[in-house]
Structures are given as C-alpha cells and as structure tokens.
Amino acid sequence: MKTKLAVFVVLVAALLVGCGCEKRGRGGEGARSDVQEAAMKTYVAPGYMYKYYIFKSGGHSGQVYVYGVPSMRHISTIPVFTPYPATGYGFDKESKEMLGGFTWGDAHHPSISETNGDYDGRWLFISDNANNRMARIDLRDFKTKQILGPIPNVSGNHCSSFCTENTEYILAGSRFSIPLPKGTYEKIEDYATKFKGIVAGIAVDKNTGNMSLGWEVLMPPFNYDLGDAGKGPSKDWGFWTCYNSERATGKLEVTSTQKDRDYVAAVNWPAAEKAIKDGKFKMIGGVKVIDPKNVEGIVYLLPAAKSPHGVDVSPDGKYIIASGKLQSITTVFNIEKMLTAIQKKDFTGNEDGIPVLNYDAIKDAEVNVGLGPLHTQFDDKGNAYTSLFVESAVAKWKLGTWEVVDKIPVSYNIGHLTASEGDTKHPTGEFLVALNKLSHGRHLSVGPSQPEASQLIDISGEKMGLLYDAFTEPEPHYAQMIKADKLKPIEVYPKEENK
C-alpha cells in the first residue's frame, strides 16, 4: 500500500512540474495536450534564433517594438517620434534636430520596403498620425534615419504608410478634412464645399531610401481612414478607404452614418506623376496639388459598405477587399472589372468631379464574415483572414469561392492583425498575430489599466490554433512579420562611416 501511495505521489508531482503553471478555468487531459503542443511550436531555446521578426507600431509611445516569432519575446524598442532616454535618442544633436522640436508622436502602420511586391528588408516606414509626419528606419542598424514633415496640407496622417510594389511611393493622406492651405479659416456650416481632404504619395529614392513629397491629390471632405497599394495587375493603383461621405458635422456617430455605403478611393499614381510633369497642378500650401476636376483619369471612387476601415489587396493583386466595420460583410472588388468600368465610363455619379464607379459592375462578392470586420491578411493557400472587432474573432475564408471555412475567438476586441508576410505577393502561411484592444483576465493583475494583447495563431493547417498570449505597451496599430533571413543587420559600423 505504501509503495502504491509513493508511486501515486511521484506521478502527481511529475504532472505538476511538467505543467509549471496555474491552470485557470475549465480543462482536462485534452487541454493539457493542446498546451503542450502549442509550447513545442513556440519555444525557442536559449541561443537559438527566431524565424521571423515582427515590427509593431507603438501608438502614442511614438516608437516601434521589435518581437521575435514564434516565441513572441520582445527584443528591442526602436525610438522614432519620441525621445528615448535609455539610448539618448532625442537628446543628442542629430536626433534632436530630426525630431524638429516635437516631443511625442502617434506611430501607426509600419510598412517594410518592397521589391516586386515582396519585403526586401531594407527600410521600415511608419507614420505619425498626430503630427502628420513620416519616418524611415534603416533595418541595417535598426535606427531612425529620417523624419519627413509635417506634410503640407495633410491633417491626421492616419491612412499611411503603405509601400507601392517597388517602394516608388509611400501612401499618405488626411483623416480630417480642413480648409486649405493650413491656417486658413472657413465656417463649419460650409464644411461640404469649403473643406478638403488630401491623399498623397511620398517619393522614395530607390538607392538611399530618402523621402520627399511626390504628389498630392485634392479630395472631397471625407475622412480618409486606411489604405493599401496594388500588386501585379493593380500595381499602378493606391487605395484609400473613406467614411463620412455625407460631409456631415456635429454628432458624427449619427450624422456621418446615414448612407448605406461610403467609398474606397482608387488613385492611379503613374497618372498623378504625369500630371505633375505636365504642369497640371496648382500650388496649395507651397506644394503641387492635382485637382481631379481639372485632370481626368487620376482618381475614382468605389462604393463600399458603410464606414469601411481596412482595404487590403490580395497577393495576386486581383482583389481589393474593403471591410465595412458597421456591417457584417467584406466587399471584394475585382481589378479587371474596375478597369473595364473605367474604360466604359460605367459611372453612377460623381463627387466633386471624381467619378463613382457602378458598384454592381466592379464587385465580385460580399462575404458575410461576421460582426465588425476591420482588416484582412492572406496565406499561401488562397485564404484570407479578417479581424472581427465586435465578435472578437478571426474569420478564415476562401478567395474565389467566398466561403468562411473557419473562425477562432480571440481575447478581446481585435483591431489589426498580421500574418507571416501576409500582405505581400508571397505569404508564407505559418503564423498570424491578433492585435487585440483588451486583455482582461489573461494575465496577472496590474491594476485598472490593462496591457494590449497579442495572440499568436497557427494558420499552417486546415484549422486555426491559438499558440500564445503576449502583452504589449498600448497601442499597436498594425504590425508586419518578415522572415528573419531577409534582414542583414550589422553589429559593427564600417570604419569609413565613422565621421
């Protein structure tokens, strides 16, 4: 009897040691097995390297956070828009001059430089939503090398930064329409006619990465929210979502949601380049601005489900996917149908001279993904993954057949998501990270203020599987995940650069 009892005690002790954690909530042998399998997929032993880097925007911290995947360990913080005493950034002469007197920023939407639609690992661009700036980080040494701005005529650079297929431009634009040029005054009663929005292309030198203002397009007074650049057959186009096509003021939660559809703005950037070259612009705020009333073929409007937030282009460049967060669908537009509608002038109206394309002529599908769709990423098997803010879930659905094939709950209220190289021409289809707004009950208590939650999800199989919870400083607004072997960081600066 004593021998049996001793064996039993040893077995129980072994199980407790093997778990090494406090299990909360329901679970059993099956749950332990899932936990062990997840641990095997995420564990990176000391001294071993990670398979992917993930670059997360730092929101109001003004910085960029670097993590390793699959371990989800924080590796470093790259100071960008805000002084960082730990390294002296913002205190030495060079970085202080680069910050230009600003002491904070709102870092949104990192974008890794691309060649032929795939990450090339040279630079990381990121926007400052608060102060209308753009920064470039050199991924050779993980240092901020340039801050451009404030960008003239742009107010609230939220719909940024997104690289074109060969990093010719970084897309930018106004979240808030204002009287132009900046500093002028118009009555709010004249908002619909006297206020204007801007979308812009920030030109990038292909050798140095140096940024300069390429072109701006004058737009109706909508709120330009997010964007993406085309690939392949859509490579000449930049896309921006916009809401408040009502041109409303006052209680915007009511006044700006009256229409069933708002728009995705599609800008042909080679046409914008040509217009500037041909002198078809006017000077506003000291820069060259194209007015679509005077120049045809620059921009078109695609009707999209009410208050679209994210717009994402599929890896093959064929589909433009807009997610209307106040409806349960994502709308899939076909680039070939869009170009045909433009050629045939299949329009249903115009906004300040900008043609509105026939919705039924350009859409391929309305996919009923779930409640509160925001953003979409892709894998290498023809699947799309859409974040559902209201439902607190990720929906996996099939391009072409438009069927939802899987869903996984996340904790909680997901905003952005990023998959392994999931916004390039060649996603790898291994991992997805859900960037959640809330995390209550998923960690040791740290008082009333809670960290953000980043949940690592395995997307390599038929069904998605939750692997790991990580917690970040508030508040990541998008991230990108790149293969580690695409980056070639230095550890010692060449002597000739020591000037």
Model-derived features: where do they sit?
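Bacterial N-terminal signal peptides that target proteins for export
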Residues: 1-7
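Predominantly soluble domains enriched in secretory-pathway, periplasmic, or organellar proteins
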Residues: 21-499
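Bacterial N-terminal signal peptides
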Residues: 9-16
